[in-house]
Amino acid sequence: MKKNVAVIGSSGAIGNAVSKILLDDETVQSVYNFSRSISTNTSDKENRIYIDIENEESIKDAVDKIPQDIKFDLIFVATGILHNENDVYPEKSIRDISADKFKKVLMINTVGPALI
């Protein structure tokens, strides 16, 4: 039986690489790619669904777009943040830690994936 796979965070480097490998795998029936960046499907077995793991409503909306009869054989979570272009970066001192930055990192790296 062919597998159904979900890749959460498929627009990042790791998620995108995993998705490409799965799309080329003949034992995989369908790949559901979840990300904030939605583009055109590259394969008949690919399904792209918008998700923002910092937003609980977005997670619920993404789940609602999965057909009821789909059961995933593998869920690969490739979300995460160490730094971004704005205000989140690796702390070099305890003074660099702020509540807002800490909340953002926890939401993306821990809470969001747990809600999925």
Model-derived segments and their meaning:
Residues 8-23:
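N-terminal Rossmann NAD(P)H-binding glycine-rich loop of SDR-like oxidoreductase domains
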Residues 23-41:
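Conserved glycine-rich Rossmann-like NAD(P)H-binding loop of the short-chain dehydrogenase/reductase
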Residues 43-58:
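Rossmann-fold cofactor-recognition segment
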Residues 59-63:
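A conserved hydrophobic alpha-helix of the Rossmann-fold in NAD(P)-dependent oxidoreductases
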Residues 65-70:
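Glycine-rich phosphate-binding loop signature in dinucleotide/nucleotide-binding domains
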Residues 73-76, 103:
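Conserved catalytic-site loops of classical short-chain dehydrogenases/reductases
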Residues 76-90:
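Conserved NAD(P)H cofactor-binding loop of Rossmann-fold oxidoreductase domains
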Residues 95-114:
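Catalytic Tyr-X3-Lys loop
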